[in-house]
């Protein structure tokens, strides 16, 4: 996991605002969640051929579509259109506090893995991803908060991780909990439509899912940290669901 066949290239790394177009298929775990009419409403990440992780607030239903292998939404590239058979939402998901903003989608048929489609590694409960570490988020979310529509091509942005203490200075102490991790405030951000998608960090040369795009500034301010569900804290629940299903 976590090793793209096509290498990503991220500027300044050696809902996405002030990002850049990704190298096509260089984030092979990136999923587009779409309504049956093809409208993209959230992102997600492939964690193995049968499972996708996304945000609980995306409200995925079994009639939605899971698209893997996509780069340009406007082209009929070699995508796989998959169906969810079951959706599991964290039992402690709270839409008021936005705590535990994670859902797992079991696919009705497995994704076919290959050059353009492969899973991301999941952060272990014991992993430490330090503040200041440069990580990358990707998605088809708005490139500015008042844009008329989402971009066709997958966007990416490098963002530094931030400590929860520092993040609380922006959002207030009661908003940022231990099941959240913040990143950004450095000139780029996630925006509407990126929700559920990945925040990945490179650890031991593999890309590891550290955050799930959860919430942030309503105007997608690039000087305000965006908030992600903290995968290391939620890993135990993920393992439980995968083991039982």
Swiss-Prot record:
Source taxon at top rank: Eukaryota
Assigned keywords, A-Z: Digestion, Disulfide bond, Hydrolase, Protease, Secreted, Serine protease, Zymogen
Catalytically driven reaction(s): Preferential cleavage: Tyr-|-Xaa, Trp-|-Xaa, Phe-|-Xaa, Leu-|-Xaa
Localization in the cell: Secreted, Extracellular space
Enzymatic class: hydrolase
GO cellular component, one term: extracellular region
Domain Peptidase S1: 16-243
Active site: 57 (charge relay system), 101 (charge relay system), 195 (charge relay system)
Short name of any one Pfam family annotated for the protein: Trypsin
GO process terms (BP): digestion; proteolysis
Primary subcellular site in the record, as a coarse category: secreted
Similarity comment: Belongs to the peptidase S1 family.
Stated name of the protein: Chymotrypsin B
Organism the protein comes from: Gadus morhua
Phylogenetic placement of the source organism: Eukaryota, Metazoa, Chordata, Craniata, Vertebrata
């Amino acid at each position: 996991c976590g090793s793209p066949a096509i290498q990503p290239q991220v500027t300044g790394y050696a809902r996405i605002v002030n990002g850049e177009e990704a190298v096509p298929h260089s984030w092979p775990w990136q999923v587009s969640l779409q309504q049956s009419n093809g409208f993209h409403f959230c992102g997600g990440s492939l964690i193995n051929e049968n499972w996708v992780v996304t945000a609980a607030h995306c409200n995925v239903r079994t009639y939605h579509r899971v698209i893997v292998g996509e780069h340009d939404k406007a082209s009929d590239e070699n995508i796989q259109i998959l169906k969810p058979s079951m959706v599991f939402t964290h039992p402690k998901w709270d839409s008021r506090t936005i705590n535990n903003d994670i859902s797992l989608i079991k696919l009705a048929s497995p994704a076919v893995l290959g050059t353009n489609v492969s899973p991301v590694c999941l952060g272990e409960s014991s992993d430490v991803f330090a503040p200041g570490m440069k990580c990358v988020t990707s998605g088809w979310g708005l490139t500015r908060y008042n844009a008329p529509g989402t971009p066709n091509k997958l966007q990416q942005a490098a963002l530094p991780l931030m400590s929860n203490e520092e993040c609380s200075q922006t959002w207030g102490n009661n908003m940022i909990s231990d099941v959240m991790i913040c990143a950004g405030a450095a000139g780029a951000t996630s925006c509407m439509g990126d929700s559920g998608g990945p925040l990945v960090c490179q650890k031991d040369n593999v890309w590891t899912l550290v955050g799930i795009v959860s919430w942030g500034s309503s105007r997608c301010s690039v000087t305000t940290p965006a908030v992600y569900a903290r995968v290391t804290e939620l890993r135990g629940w993920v393992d439980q669901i995968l083991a039982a299903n």
